[in-house]
C-alpha cells in the first residue's frame, strides 16, 4: 500500500473503519501506516507486523 490508497483499519472491538494512507514507514519488523480517519483527519499510526495475520491492522479497501 502507498500514500493516498484507500484502506480499512482494525480498531479495538469495533467494525473496520475506512481511511486514506497519509504516510508509510518501513521497519524490519513490519510497516507503519499513518491513516486519516473521519474522526482523526490528521491521522493515526497503525503497525502491520510482517509475519502475523493477527498483527495486520491496515488492509486495502476492496469495493
Swiss-Prot record:
InterPro entries: Dextransucrase_DSRB. HAMAP family: DsrB (MF_01549). Belongs to the DsrB family. This is Protein DsrB. It comes from Yersinia enterocolitica serotype O:8 / biotype 1B (strain NCTC 13174 / 8081).
